Amino acid sequence: MSSKKPVVLVIRDGWGRNPLGPDVAKEYGDATVLADTPFTDYLLANYPHSLLGASGEDVGLPDGQMGNSEVGHLNLGAGRVVFQDLCRVDNAIKDGSMGENAVLKTAFSQAASSRLHLLGLVSDGGVHSHINHLIGIVKYAYEAGVRDICIHAITDGRDCSPTSGVGFIRQLEEAVRPYGAKIATVVGRFYAMDRDKRWDRNKLAWDAIVLGRGEQCSCSPAEYVEQCYAKGETDEFLKPGIFAYGNEQRVRDNDVVFFFNFRADRARQMSDAFLYPEFDGFDREVTPKVHYVTLTEYDAKYPSPIVFEQEQLNNIFGQIVSEAGKTQLRIAETEKYAHVTFFFNGGVETQFPGEDRILVPSPREVATYDLKPQMSAAEVADKFVDAVNKYDVVIMNFANGDMVGHTGFVEAGIAACEAVDSALEKCVKKVLELGGKLLITADHGNAEHMRNEDGSPNTAHTTNLVDLIYVADDKDQVTLSDGILADVAPTLLSLMGLKQPAEMSGHSLVTPGK
């Protein structure tokens, strides 16, 4: 069988372009500049490159809101600006339609005679949730007659500063006081929002939320968080603190549990424990029969009502490629596998005809990826090189820049970028050998800003632009324009000679001629 001449999209996750430049790279922890990346340097010196907007209104988020992996891959695959759940919920709270939502009305009606548990990430990170959504939900619940409202607050420290949690907890305490709601639990997202089946972490969160196990606190939730900081703990890793109904079954039969995160991937494992009687990830000890509600669709198979149903996207990139009879491959390690499949395919689990997938396991032997910043980049590259000649188009992701960027350890970030650079070289050389073409970009920034001005770690995403690099033998005959992530799918289609559908509002950024 003859080899294909593949078109390849390489997503260097979390690899943005810091506008402050190399002169302040050390001060701001720009791992992408501080790293020794000879191949990336070679590409930028010898191939057309431009910049893409990957945050705010460019990707369907509020102005100034940092981008994230879910949003980035949705826009990359859809070829249009996809308005995000963050904005949809914001608008529903502002215009009052949230209070008229039928799913919420039913949930609040049941909770009026039992207990309402609100579970989710408490920050303004806007990646998985937003504190304003929680405050709005509490208000609407109170107005619907719910009087026993327990908040199980998951602290962030990843999509915002590692010690910003105390401020959010204080803000929440003040905001919900008029409605009699109480913060019953505080626990870090490391435990409550694992997505890699490290069930021992979820067990700690479950025991706290359901059984009231953890540090029994007589102080306020904000004071507890401050005490954790004094012991060297940061928001992501806070052990459970219990502030109401301690050491008893707090989630009971007929209670309502509402997970208010709008992003699905890190909400599924705890949801599985609540929803499935046969769940065996860890010993739950008790399995309360609750009315479980999710803000958005976490899994199409879940037997639970959804407050905001998913908007369906038609004629996305994978669909167009499939309908043209072309073959496609999606490849990433575990941490970003959902992004090149579920999110790139419009937020649905559909695997198109002609679409194959390769999942490379992420390292399980380390708790955080600063301890192994290379992650599985080399293995992803090896699998890619072995498979690429069989496909018309490949979508691949290197997770390192984002996953290690979230740790805030600059030296680890440097090693992560170097690992990606080395793996990228192997992939690019193989594609060029086959006569193929590549677009190299990112879904959002992160690794280019790992240190704050005061020297503290910056673990959050950024609002920076991301590179777009065109790599092909005809590099001297094309011009590459600036754009946004939604322009990538139309560009890929043009490189494949496929017609762009009307639903795609993006534009091809590759034009013939210099």
UniProtKB/Swiss-Prot annotation:
- What do the Gene Ontology cellular component annotations say? cytosol
- Residues binding Mn(2+) 1 are 402, 406, 461
Q: Where does substrate bind?
A: 128, 158-159, 189, 195, 263-266, 336
Reactions catalysed, semicolon-separated, are:
(2R)-2-phosphoglycerate = (2R)-3-phosphoglycerate
Pathway the protein takes part in: Carbohydrate degradation; glycolysis; pyruvate from D-glyceraldehyde 3-phosphate: step 3/5
Gene3D superfamilies named in the record: Alkaline Phosphatase, subunit A (3.40.720.10), BPG-independent phosphoglycerate mutase, domain B (3.40.1450.10)
GO BP field:
glucose catabolic process; glycolytic process
SUPFAM superfamilies this protein is in? 2,3-Bisphosphoglycerate-independent phosphoglycerate mutase, substrate-binding domain, Alkaline phosphatase-like
Class of enzymatic activity (EC top level) = isomerase
Catalytic residue list: 69 (phosphoserine intermediate)
| Note describing how the cofactor binds | Binds 2 manganese ions per subunit.
| E.C. designation(s) | 5.4.2.12
Essential cofactor(s): Mn(2+)
Alphabetical UniProt keywords:
Glycolysis, Isomerase, Manganese, Metal-binding
Q: Name one GO molecular function term.
A: phosphoglycerate mutase activity
The record's HAMAP family line, in alphabetical order, gives: GpmI
What the protein does?
Catalyzes the interconversion of 2-phosphoglycerate and 3-phosphoglycerate.
- Subunit comment for this entry? Monomer.
Q: Which family does it belong to?
A: Belongs to the BPG-independent phosphoglycerate mutase family.
PANTHER family per record: 2,3-BISPHOSPHOGLYCERATE-INDEPENDENT PHOSPHOGLYCERATE MUTASE
Tell me what this protein is called.
2,3-bisphosphoglycerate-independent phosphoglycerate mutase
In which organism is this protein found? Answer: Akkermansia muciniphila (strain ATCC BAA-835 / DSM 22959 / JCM 33894 / BCRC 81048 / CCUG 64013 / CIP 107961 / Muc)
